[in-house]
């Protein structure tokens, strides 16, 4: 693995350990060069309660690797989480900087009704 990826995963591990200690439901984000994925994971980490990505049929047609797509994913994951009965989550940015697509997804999820 590259040094950049190793340091990102180390940051993610530290944050996830803290969330596991607090036993909170988390909104986990993964970003690749072409797509962005979001999952709402149960407090014990065993179940995915809601998920959305730019690979979903609703979002696949437009551009998938930009801020607009991340905003749509954020709104969709918030809608699905509310349907699953989740309103409070901890934001797991997976070691990515809170900037650009990750920030856009978080802001859209907040607007959709999720509380961080």
From Swiss-Prot:
Keyword annotations: Ribonucleoprotein, Ribosomal protein, RNA-binding, rRNA-binding
Ubl conjugation recorded as keyword: no
Gene Ontology MF annotations: 5S rRNA binding; structural constituent of ribosome
InterPro entries assigned to the protein according to its UniProt record, in alphabetical order: Ribosomal_uL18_bac-type, Ribosomal_uL18_bac/euk
GO BP annotations, alphabetical order: translation
Gene Ontology cellular-component annotations: cytosolic large ribosomal subunit
Keyword Transcription: no
Quaternary assembly: Part of the 50S ribosomal subunit; part of the 5S rRNA/L5/L18/L25 subcomplex. Contacts the 5S and 23S rRNAs.
Function summary: This is one of the proteins that bind and probably mediate the attachment of the 5S RNA into the large ribosomal subunit, where it forms part of the central protuberance.
Similarity-based family: Belongs to the universal ribosomal protein uL18 family.
Protein name in UniProt: Large ribosomal subunit protein uL18
Organism from which the protein derives: Pseudomonas putida (strain W619)
Gene this protein is translated from: rplR
């Amino acid at each position: 693995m590259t040094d950049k990826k190793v340091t990102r995963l180390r940051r993610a591990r530290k944050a996830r350990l803290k969330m596991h200690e607090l036993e909170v439901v988390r909104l986990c984000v993964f970003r690749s060069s072409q797509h962005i994925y979001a999952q709402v994971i149960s407090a014990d980490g065993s179940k995915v309660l809601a998920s959305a990505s730019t690979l979903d049929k609703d979002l696949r047609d437009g551009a998938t690797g930009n801020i607009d797509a991340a905003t749509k994913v954020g709104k969709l994951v918030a809608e699905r989480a509310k349907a699953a009965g989740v309103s409070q989550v901890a934001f797991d940015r997976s070691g990515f900087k809170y900037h650009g697509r990750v920030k856009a997804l978080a802001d859209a999820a907040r607007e959709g009704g999720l509380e961080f």
